[in-house]
């Protein structure tokens, strides 16, 4: 049982090898979507079962370590340095996203958009209209918008602080109920009821470990 986790969790879920292997295949499909002609995808697909099984064993055995990232420069829309994870590690990133995005999204403000289903361009336009109406006193006063960017944001993230925020959010949400109307992928054999908590459909011990592996990896030092 997780420390400080909500006591609503009655039967904490433990990830099985069979389930993880299936979830890794789904993550592979997500990571390779639109990229099947890329050489690194083709190379991984040549021994797909072997590669996914090896990745599964590393994750279950808590021996997984990300490979060095590939560093390169892009010029459009502006010159910047990019650190690209190896394809096998992108699969792990998609796995983590699939396991956690619906959990984290419940802690985000309404104006968080990136990678959230239902919060596309139209939603953004409607939210902008709402804020303009609110700031202009229903179109009666002038209001202003400012476009900002944080220089070197991803290069200077305080990873220890981010890890603390992420793990605290996971622990807090582990005891929350899963919405019956939510499209939540469930582990094999788990039935969703009005009392089902996130801790009963996600292995939070595994997620907390994987969170640390992803968050604390600095691509600038691992390339």
Predicted regions, residues:
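Short, compositionally biased low-complexity segments
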Residues: 1-3, 18-34, 66-70, 97-104, ...
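Amphipathic alpha-helical segments in well-ordered regions
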Residues: 95-99, 103, 169, 214
């Amino acid at each position: 049982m997780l420390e400080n986790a909500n006591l609503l969790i009655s039967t904490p879920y433990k990830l099985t090898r069979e389930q993880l292997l299936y979830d890794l295949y789904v993550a592979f499909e997500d990571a390779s979507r639109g990229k099947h002609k890329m050489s690194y995808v083709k190379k991984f697909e040549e021994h797909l079962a072997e590669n996914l099984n090896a990745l599964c064993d590393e994750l279950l055995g808590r021996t997984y370590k990300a490979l060095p990232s590939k560093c390169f420069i892009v010029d459009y829309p502006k010159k910047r340095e990019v650190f690209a994870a190896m394809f096998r590690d992108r699969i792990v990133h998609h796995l983590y996203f699939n396991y956690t995005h619906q959990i984290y999204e419940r802690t985000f403000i309404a104006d968080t958009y990136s990678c959230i289903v239902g919060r596309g361009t139209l939603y953004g336009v409607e939210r902008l209209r709402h804020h303009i109406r609110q700031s202009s006193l229903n179109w009666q006063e002038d209001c202003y918008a400012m476009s900002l960017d944080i220089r070197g944001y991803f290069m200077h993230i305080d990873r220890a602080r981010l890890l603390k925020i992420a793990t605290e959010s996971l622990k807090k949400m582990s005891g929350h109920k899963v919405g019956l109307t939510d499209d939540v992928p469930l582990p094999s054999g788990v039935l969703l009821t009005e009392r089902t908590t996130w801790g009963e459909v996600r292995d939070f011990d595994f997620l907390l470990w994987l969170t640390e592996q992803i968050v604390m990896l600095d691509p600038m030092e691992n390339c």
